[in-house]
């Protein structure tokens, strides 16, 4: 009844609702859901579950906060800017060593309880009996971290290779133990990891097939770890046994000492301190022995190659260039020049010169540069890789080998991108490197080293060459010392902007000559228009005349040098010899004597070296006379023993003319300000990319490509010591008439372009003499004439000895005093009237 009553009431209610809504269709009544009362026990369980979930969430949140805080603190410590990457790497290695000690104590000696017992139990659960070798593996990884440089490119390959070897070893250990099933037995075999690797293979393929598969996996991991391909394995094994690699002990014996071996064909030095990851490499020969390919940047050990033969750029028959290996500082001071000196003159001791530090090896900065270059090649999808590195004192040359079908232009077109990647502008490319199938990319070193002149002069090959005109140049990019013979150049053109190292080279050249030659062997003419560069050498016994500072006297000295050359050629022609060396030998032996009735006494001719510190000043003053004299000397003076060294900081076409370039075959270019200057001095680009401070390109006679070198440096104290040693032994014997201008007997009168206006010329003379100021601009202002006419007026006054020669932008020296003005004007008028009588 109750249910029916409820149903009726429900129907009544629904019908009322339908009527009120205006709905004619009746609906089925919805029975109400009965309320069910849950038992008390189930309600308590729900409350407990909710509380547990809440506690779990709270614990999880607390754990995440703690973990993030600890991780952030650890990362902040690891990324601290004041901790260098090398120190962080050492910290990880030391932590691994500590872990190896704990694992060894717990697994070998059952010590370090209670933590040791827990560590041993956990490790045996996962890797089983392999826990015995785990401390050795951890210690080996720590040693590798401490002794190698980090390399992000090789890290994935090394990790994958080591993982494959470890898993394959555990799987084989599981199979060797009979594939145990129970956890207790697996703890004595290969643990859970061995069971997870070897179990499915043995169940699905049987142990006879699973074992070879695991062995192949371990072999592939070994190939990844060493960076070797399968086809290279026979060559690697053959090279190991052929060279006795297993019987030799490669160590860092050259860290503190550097051997000097000038024997042709001697092996290069082994700089084994520049490693990437776990890779080891020495020279090219050692790379072939160990068989690691050089197709990937990460698999290359960047090294200091020390070749034993010159580059093909310096060929036989060209200017003699010696390449030498470094020497220790102790040997410099104990050796003397290996040749006999006639007479009482003694050459200055090499102990007066300072020696340099041992050469630096490649560093982490070089690895970073190589990685940056490789990254640029990868970004632009160029099939090429950095395969080698040669560190010099100033720059490092990275060798890039191209893939099949890749044009060299693709590399050279990326020069600016590479410069951007390595954060420098002075990137020079050498395509290709002489004697190698590779493109060279030369990048400046961040830690450049100084090259001392003493190191170059005391090198074995320099000492074995007893010629008195051998000079020390510096050290090339491969770390070899370079010296050259001026007699074989036979003339040298040096150019470079301010601060490029040109003056340092001139000083090194002069000190080289002073320490290797006597005044009877070499005489010098020093022309210094700057008046300060060559002043320290004033009074040395090798000088023919005092140091020349006036351009007019310099031109006269060059003319005298031409006459001296002609005189020597006449003597050689009369003696039927072709070179001054042969003439001197015959004079010493008595084969050449003066004819009967002649009072002349034949003596050996010394070499004459004329050094012009600034050619531009001479070409501005007397271009025609200077150029004619230089061209005649450079064309003919080689056999006469006369040599020129022309230096300028403005190698423009009006200074270094075509005739001068044609007859001066050897060039030395330091940093220039523009590409045009580089092409003027070298006939090719390159000098504009040099970084200054002695960085130069040496192009000897007969070479097609220049050699990059760091010029030798010498201090003012060393120069003073050597010059003093020379002055104390002899006084200079000057030759008369060297700087005296030759008079032709002709007289230059008033220029016809002036219009024979004597009044203008007389006014100009009166202005200059009365003011004692010989300036062309003053004549322009006072006389209101043009620049050309004022210049001709000044030249006319110079021909009449009223003013001195031009000194560039300075005012000319007035030679006539103010009280002599009247007599000078009368003399000019008298000469003009005499000339004017012939007119009409």
UniProtKB/Swiss-Prot annotation:
Pfam families: FtsK_4TM, FtsK_alpha, FtsK_gamma, FtsK_SpoIIIE. Residues 1-26 have a biased composition (Polar residues). It is a multi-pass membrane protein. GO terms for molecular function: ATP binding; DNA binding. Residues 226-840 are cytoplasmic. ATP binds at residues 499-504. Keywords: ATP-binding, Cell cycle, Cell division, Cell membrane, Chromosome partition, DNA-binding, Membrane, Nucleotide-binding, Transmembrane, Transmembrane helix. The chain crosses the membrane at residues 92-112, 126-146, 158-178, 205-225. PROSITE patterns: FTSK. SMART domains: Ftsk_gamma. InterPro entries: FtsK/SpoIIIE/SftA (IPR050206), FtsK_4TM (IPR025199), FtsK_alpha (IPR041027), FtsK_dom (IPR002543), Ftsk_gamma (IPR018541), P-loop_NTPase (IPR027417), WH-like_DNA-bd_sf (IPR036388), WH_DNA-bd_sf (IPR036390). It is found in: Cell membrane. One of its GO terms (cellular component) is plasma membrane. SUPFAM superfamilies: P-loop containing nucleoside triphosphate hydrolases (SSF52540), Winged helix' DNA-binding domain (SSF46785). Belongs to the FtsK/SpoIIIE/SftA family. Consists of an N-terminal domain, which is sufficient for the localization to the septal ring and is required for cell division, followed by a linker domain, and a C-terminal domain, which forms the translocation motor involved in chromosome segregation. The C-terminal domain can be further subdivided into alpha, beta and gamma subdomains. The alpha and beta subdomains form the DNA pump, and the gamma subdomain is a regulatory subdomain. PANTHER family: DNA TRANSLOCASE FTSK (PTHR22683:SF41), SPORULATION PROTEIN RELATED (PTHR22683). Essential cell division protein that coordinates cell division and chromosome segregation. The N-terminus is involved in assembly of the cell-division machinery. The C-terminus functions as a DNA motor that moves dsDNA in an ATP-dependent manner towards the dif recombination site, which is located within the replication terminus region. Required for activation of the Xer recombinase, allowing activation of chromosome unlinking by recombination. This is DNA translocase FtsK.
């Amino acid at each position: 009844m109750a249910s029916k009553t409820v149903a009726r009431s429900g129907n009544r209610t629904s019908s009322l609702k339908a009527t009120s809504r205006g709905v004619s269709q009746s609906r089925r009544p919805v029975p109400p859901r009965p309320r069910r009362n849950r038992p008390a026990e189930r309600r308590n369980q729900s409350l407990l579950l909710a509380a547990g979930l809440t506690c779990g969430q709270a614990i999880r949140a607390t754990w995440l906060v703690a973990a993030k805080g600890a991780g952030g603190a650890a990362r902040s410590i690891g990324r601290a800017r004041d901790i260098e990457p090398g120190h962080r790497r050492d910290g990880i290695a030391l932590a691994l060593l500590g872990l190896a000690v704990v694992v060894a104590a717990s697994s070998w000696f059952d010590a370090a309880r209670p933590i040791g017992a827990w560590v041993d139990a956990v490790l045996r659960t996962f890797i089983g009996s392999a826990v015995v070798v785990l401390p050795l593996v951890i210690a080996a990884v720590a040693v590798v971290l401490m002794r190698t440089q980090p390399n992000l490119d090789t890290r994935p390959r090394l990790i994958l290779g080591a993982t494959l070897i470890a898993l394959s070893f555990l799987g084989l250990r599981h199979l060797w133990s009979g594939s145990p099933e129970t956890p207790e037995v697996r703890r004595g075999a290969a643990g859970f990891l061995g069971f997870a690797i070897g179990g499915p293979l043995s169940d699905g393929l049987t142990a006879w097939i699973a074992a070879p598969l695991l062995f192949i996996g371990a072999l592939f991991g070994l190939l990844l770890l060493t960076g070797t391909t399968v086809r290279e394995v026979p060559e690697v094994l053959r090279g190991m046994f052929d060279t006795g690699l297993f019987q030799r002990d490669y160590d860092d014996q050259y860290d503190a000492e550097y051997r000097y071996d000038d024997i042709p064909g001697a092996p290069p030095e082994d700089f084994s301190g520049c490693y990437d990851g776990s890779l080891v490499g020495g020279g090219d020969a050692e790379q072939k022995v160990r068989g690691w390919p050089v197709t990937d940047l990460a698999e290359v050990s960047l090294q200091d190659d020390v070749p034993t033969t010159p580059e093909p750029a310096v060929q036989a028959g060209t200017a003699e260039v010696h390449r030498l290996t470094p020497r220790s500082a102790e040997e410099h001071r104990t050796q003397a020049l290996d040749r006999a000196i006639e007479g009482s003159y003694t050459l200055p001791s090499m102990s007066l010169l300072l020696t340099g530090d041992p050469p630096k090896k490649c560093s982490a900065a070089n690895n970073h540069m190589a990685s940056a270059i490789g990254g640029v090649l990868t970004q632009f999808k160029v099939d090429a890789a950095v395969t080698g590195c040669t560190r010099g004192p100033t720059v490092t040359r990275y060798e890039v080998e191209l893939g099949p079908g890749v044009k060299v232009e693709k590399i050279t077109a990326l020069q600016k991108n590479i410069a951007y990647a390595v954060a420098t502008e002075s990137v020079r490319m050498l395509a290709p490197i002489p004697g190698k199938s590779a493109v060279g990319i030369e990048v400046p070193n961040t830690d450049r080293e100084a090259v001392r002149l003493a190191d170059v002069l005391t090198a074995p090959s320099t000492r074995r060459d007893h010629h008195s005109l051998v000079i020390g140049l510096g050290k090339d990019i491969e770390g070899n010392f370079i010296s050259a013979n001026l007699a074989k150049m036979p003339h040298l053109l040096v150019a470079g902007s301010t601060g490029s190292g040109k003056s340092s080279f001139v000083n090194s050249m002069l000190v080289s000559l002073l320490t290797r030659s006597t005044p009877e062997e070499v005489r010098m003419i020093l022309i210094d228009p700057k008046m300060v560069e060559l002043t320290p050498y004033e009074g040395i016994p090798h000088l023919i005349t005092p140091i020349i500072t006036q351009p007019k006297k310099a031109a006269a000295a060059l003319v005298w040098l031409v006459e001296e050359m002609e005189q020597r050629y006449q003597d050689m022609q009369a003696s039927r010899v072709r070179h001054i060396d042969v003439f001197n030998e015959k004079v010493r032996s008595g084969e050449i004597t003066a004819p009967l009735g002649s009072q002349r006494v034949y003596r050996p001719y010394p070499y004459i070296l004329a050094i012009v510190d600034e050619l531009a000043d001479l070409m501005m003053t007397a271009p025609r006379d200077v150029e004619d004299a230089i061209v005649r000397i450079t064309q003919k003076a080689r056999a006469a023993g006369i040599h020129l060294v022309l230096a300028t900081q403005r190698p423009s076409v009006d200074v270094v003319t075509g005739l001068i370039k044609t007859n001066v075959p050897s060039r030395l270019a330091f940093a220039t300000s523009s590409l045009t200057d580089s092409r003027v001095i070298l006939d090719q680009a390159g000098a504009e990319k040099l970084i200054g401070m002695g960085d130069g390109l040496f192009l000897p006679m007969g070479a097609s490509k220049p050699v990059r070198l760091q010029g030798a440096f010498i201090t003012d104290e060393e120069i003073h010591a050597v010059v003093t040693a020379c002055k104390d032994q002899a006084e200079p014997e000057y030759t008369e008439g060297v700087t005296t201008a030759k008079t032709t007997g002709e007289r230059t009168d008033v220029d016809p372009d002036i219009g024979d206006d004597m009044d203008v010329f007389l006014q100009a003379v009166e202005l200059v003499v009365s003011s004692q100021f010989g300036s062309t601009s003053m004549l322009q202002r006072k006389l209101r004439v043009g620049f050309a006419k004022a210049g001709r007026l000044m030249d006319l006054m110079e021909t009449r000895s009223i003013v001195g020669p031009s000194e560039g932008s300075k005012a000319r020296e007035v030679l006539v005093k103010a009280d002599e003005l009247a007599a000078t004007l009368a003399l000019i008028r008298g000469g003009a009237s005499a000339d004017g009588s012939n007119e009409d």
